[in-house]
Amino acid sequence: MAVAFNRDKPHCNIGTIGHVDHGKTSLATAITIVSSELSDGAVKVKNYDEIDSAPEERARGITIQTAHVEFISKKRHYALVDCPGHVDYIKNMITGASQTDGLILVVSGVDGVMPQTREHVLLAKQVGVPSIIVCINKIDQADPELLELIEMEVRELLTKYDFPGDTVPIIRCSALKAINGDSDAKKGILELMDAIDDYIPQPTRVLDQPFLMPIEDVFSILGRGTVVTGRIERGVIKVGDEVEIVGLRSTQKTICTGVEMFKKELDQGQAGDNVGILLRGIKREDVERGQVLAKPGTITPHCSFEAEVYVLTKEEGGRHTPFFQNYRPQFYCRTTDVTGEIALLSGKEMVMPGDHATLSVNLVAPIAMDQGLSFAIREGGKTIGAGKVSKIIK
């Protein structure tokens, strides 16, 4: 039986990004250790292997599926998303990072800024992450003079991608020493937690709109049924509420029979919470990532829409050349990515990098859509544009 969740502090979602092996997962472990001490054991210590849990990750020592870890600071309750750090898994990072209220950029004090560090900061800008804080990790192995240079380099990088590089807090840590019980290293982790509290603003949660949660993952729990997980985008859900599963296939109705966050039972889930929702009478194969769970009748699936789109320049990491009629990239909306064919409107022959354009899009599968839905456009492993649905056609 799960214990009840204590909602006495505001909830906030943050993520870790940064180059592979710079210590993102170790940092997550160190934070749970310090938080567990701070909260008298209310937070469970998560060791490295528990966070790095997919079998292929452990074989390669890298984090693939975005892992959620809980911690409590002096001011807030957090879900920490350990964003994947391997180049093949940028797709996961897009959905992981776009669900966060802020990010910790982890940079090794030994290696400094690496190609993935740049790529992740660019992606954070592209998916609209509101704020970034920096942790220079592995300082026990680093040359102190080099640390100054690394800090300057990180500030320049953040400024380049329109984050406030001059004022971003940069905290020096040694996650591994903190894990091994070093008291000075633990102080560094605590300093990082305080900086997150103070620097990352508490987001406004949309509680008064109809419930909607993009589905990130689906599990089958023996004897209890099917659980879908995700971050609630808007509204509130209570046990006994009727919900619809919308997008990618025929809409289904079901009833919420349980809401949990970090294995603790909630009387209700609300916007901003990372939850598991137990669904009555739904089989594991009836539901998939990329669908949404919503209050009945509040959102419908569509394939065809018009959108206002900005196409990234080469300098922003986008295409080097224009695209034409019938271009078929992937559209990333919430937790799904679907191929769509683009029709250029008003007699346009092509769209150049750097252009703002109105396009008509026809997706190969219907997704839950409302006017104003944001999406990223990707092709061949890179983001080439971003847009919003301006009109639903069918």
Swiss-Prot record:
Q: Which InterPro entries match?
A: EF-Tu_GTP-bd, EF-Tu_GTPase, EFTu-like_2, EFTU_2, G_TR_CS, P-loop_NTPase, Small_GTP-bd, T_Tr_GTP-bd_dom
Q: Which keywords does this Swiss-Prot/TrEMBL entry list?
A: Cytoplasm, Elongation factor, GTP-binding, Hydrolase, Magnesium, Metal-binding, Nucleotide-binding, Protein biosynthesis
| Superkingdom of the organism of origin | Bacteria
Locate the region G4: 137-140
Residues where GTP binds:
18-25, 82-86, 137-140
Q: How does it assemble?
A: Monomer.
Q: What is the lineage of its organism?
A: Bacteria, Pseudomonadati, Pseudomonadota, Alphaproteobacteria, Rickettsiales
GO MF entry, a single one: translation elongation factor activity
Protein family per UniProt: Belongs to the TRAFAC class translation factor GTPase superfamily. Classic translation factor GTPase family. EF-Tu/EF-1A subfamily.
Its Enzyme Commission number(s) read: 3.6.5.3
Q: Could you tell me what this protein is called?
A: Elongation factor Tu 1
Q: What is its main location?
A: cytoplasm
From the record, give the transmembrane residue ranges.
none
Residues at which Mg(2+) binds: 25
The ranges of region (G5) come to 174-176
Return the annotated region ranges for G1: 18-25
Question: What Gene Ontology cellular-component terms does the record carry?
Answer: cytoplasm
